[in-house]
Amino acid sequence: MNQEFLGIKMLADQGNVDAIFGLGVSYEHGIYSEKNEEMAFYYIEKAANLGHLLAIEMLARYYLNGYGVEKDEKKSFFYQKKAVELGRTEAICELGRMYEYGIGVEKDEGKAFFYYKKAVDIGDVLALSYLSSCYWDGKGTVPDREKAEELSSLFKEKMKSMNS
């Protein structure tokens, strides 16, 4: 093990939540350590239980994809919603997607629309595409093709500017 990993481990053993989270990320990506899904899950779950917002959102992803743990869409939804409730704005769009497709929760296009709109209102670029689709198909709202095309154009414009 290298010195950076040992330093992070020492802080984690002392209860430093950011270090605990860091160990989870280290194990997930093989940074300073070998990749290890189970250890990544262990430390991300521990950080999440200590209130680390990004860890809570990551735990939702782990449960959704069965990363280091048995796949469980209901637990994934629980942690995604918890991340949003605790202020993790980056988790809002994904919560909308879970409502739209009934992932871990009963399908609810109205709530999906609500969360996509909320995500767009705070500047989430990906949410523009989902919200456009809602307006196009009338999911959770009255169909509005003009609004859908406007949002789709804005999404394409923002993606183009991000990639240049």
What are these regions (language model features)?
Residues 1-30:
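N-terminal segments that cap or nucleate solenoid repeat domains
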Residues 11, 46-47, 83, 118-119, ...:
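Canonical positions in the second alpha-helix
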Residues 13, 31-35, 49, 65-71, ...:
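Short coil/turn and helix-start
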Residues 20-29, 33, 56-65, 69, ...:
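Hydrophobic face of amphipathic alpha-helices that form TPR/SEL1-like repeat modules
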Residues 129, 133-137, 142-160:
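TPR/TPR-like (Sel1-like) alpha-helical repeat modules
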